[in-house]
Amino acid sequence: LLVPGRLQKSISRGGKMRIGGWAKLLTLLLVLALVAVACERDEEEAGGEAAGGTEAAAQAEGGTLLDEIKERGTLRCGVNNTVPGFGFDPGGGNIDGFDIDFCRAFAAAIFNTSDNIDDLIELIPIDADNRFIALQNGDYDVLVRNTTWTTSRDGAEGVAFMHPNFYDGQAMMVRKGEFDSINEMNDTSICVTTGTTTELNLADYFAERNLEFEPIAFEDNTQLQRAFIQGRCDGWTSDRSQLAGIRSQWPADEGGPESLVIMDEVMSKEPLAPGTLDTELELRDALDAVVNGVILAEELGVSSENVDQFVEDPGSGPIAALLGAPVLDPETGESAPIEHGLGLDGDFMVSVLRAVGNYGEIFNRHVGPNTDLGLQRGINALWTEGGIQYAIPFR
């Protein structure tokens, strides 16, 4: 602590100072020191707040993924291109299917148009093993690739899933006449795709029945099909819907679809759902509303064929709410469109229904009874028809 020069001289001359004078001096110096420390802390905190404010402003300026998609003008969907009916490329890069229609539906909602919808989507084929890494890396915006919703994918993989768009179950496909039940498949080789829930389910199912098997894993269905044709596998296990699609396109020179049998046993539950990054909940909520919207539209009888009629006369109940028309508020007696707060235009479902139709239309167009897959609705029927497809209310 430095002593003022005048005081030093006074002390040196007199040789001593009264105790009361020393006490006053020390008190004054202590107060000055505390004030200096407090000022320094205030400056540090102010600097920290300024830095934090700058960072928050930068994040706000950056916007969300939904904002980025709107700015970009296209929606990038990670898809499959090897599963007939769901995501399949017959050649020339023309991928189509059940999941592709959901990509179209999402784009129709985001951009609120049904015009030239394929110009608003970018389909990015991705294999099962790399789909989550690619999502985290920002290679695409939304995963629409027959993906099972599980706890670890929801948590560790960082995926925010939407309402399941297809409830499935794992099955086993074999050559006709070789096996009648999975219980007969002891000491067999089973082909499976890597990076899927199918691998784990296969091991669990066979272990529970004390069956020995050799798993032969492949990265994609093209490699797996080649191995199956070569006789390297006694069975091919995957989601039943996938096996139905693959069977429907089985080469004629290998016996065609009639040469294969999908056995009746259901090896697991497979709720298939679209997903996006769990850091992008605005996008997740917006697209989840689309999945629920097409299911609700089927329940209410609104389709691609009659949506324009309902736009002209929507009433004031659930159909009006679905289509973004004014809805009667029983408390106020007034009518106004519902404010969903989803980052979408209020009438986004009109564009969705014009582009792809309701859930039943999408199902029947790609995988239903009159397609090569010939799937029945089963548990994917509406809850009013004995299934478990059930949409949240548009309220």
Features from the language model and the residues they span:
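C-terminal motif of bacterial Sec signal peptides marking the signal peptidase cleavage site
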Residues: 34-38
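Extracytoplasmic small-molecule ligand-binding "clamshell" domains
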Residues: 58-64, 68-143, 330-332, 344, ...
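Bacterial lipoprotein signal-peptidase II cleavage site
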Residues: 40-49
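Bilobed "Venus flytrap"/periplasmic-binding protein-like clamshell domains
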Residues: 76-85, 95-112, 148, 168-226, ...
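Acidic, polar ligand-binding/catalytic clefts
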Residues: 104, 108, 115-184, 243-268, ...
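Bacterial N-terminal signal peptides that target proteins for export
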Residues: 15-26
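Extended ligand-binding regions for polar small-molecule ligands
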Residues: 40, 53-60, 104, 108, ...
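Short, Lys/Arg-enriched N-terminal segments with co-localized hydrophobic residues
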Residues: 1-16
